[in-house]
Amino acid sequence: MPLNRELTASGARFLEESATAADYRLFLLPGAPAKPGLLRVDGDGAAIAVELWAMPADAFGRFVATVPPPLSIGTLTLADGRTVKGFLVEAAATAGARDISAFGGWRAFMAQAKASA
């Protein structure tokens, strides 16, 4: 998955799968390699599958510095009401990008794309 290598190199460890509150849209951002962009929206959102990771606090700043634009780290609201730090995308980067929210998450989208290839 995009940036998983950077997460593990920073000492992060996978905790669990979860989902966002139904306040987000997921986009396929242009360019290669394929990467997702998660955007919080006012209305017409969907719950999107996400992964939760734990990272040592001393590595967090270094990791954030490696996140390429138009991605950023912000606060996500999960379906169970928890708030966590996670990847978001700048709204301007979604102009003309394919909305893939109907797949429910990046892994599901990639599985469908692979099956269609």
Feature annotation, model-predicted:
Residues 1-117:
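Glycine-aromatic micro-motifs
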